[in-house]
Amino acid sequence: MLEGRRLLITGVITNRSIAYATAVRAQELGAEILLTSFGRARRLTERAAKRLPEPVDVLELDVNSPDDLAALTAELQRRWGRVDGALHAIAHAPGDAFGGDFLATPPESAEAAFRTSAYSLNALAVALRPLWREAGDGSLVGLDFDATVAWPAYDWMGVAKAALEATSRYLARDLGGENVRVNLVSAGP
């Protein structure tokens, strides 16, 4: 089903994540994949990458770094020349943006949650756009969580997930004419 497809998968930290299960299934269906990670998590991602049915490389990507995004585009162009799809499994909020004290969250923590968990979908799409053009089409799938409910202690991450949902709609609108599909999948609570 995915024979010959080239997929970028973000967010693999352990072999217990949805992103890891996606990587396994993609390989089972014949896809060629690469993972991304950065910082302290990279060592964990590299360990998980070795447990895949076929071990893969882990590319450096801090999705908030324009330099990393540009380097990702260049490296994917060098290796593959195109990308058929990507999984956005990226989310983060500082500890003070969780925990039930929504009103006391500093603005820089709320902004960090938004930038990493929502705006990053747009940043990844911009980085991959030239590679989807080479492929003639593409798919961007993001992992979501129900943002229609004010979940206890989820706080600013819930706001970021609502922004992620809106971001995906705008990306679908703007990339649809280029044969790029943008969808979110919610794993639920």
Give, region by region, the residue ranges found by the protein language model.
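Catalytic loop of short-chain dehydrogenase/reductase
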Residues: 11-22, 92-129, 133-177, 186-189
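Conserved Rossmann-fold cofactor-binding substructure of NAD(P)-dependent oxidoreductases
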Residues: 64-78
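Canonical Rossmann dinucleotide-binding motif of NAD(H)/NADP(H)-dependent dehydrogenases/reductases
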Residues: 2-35
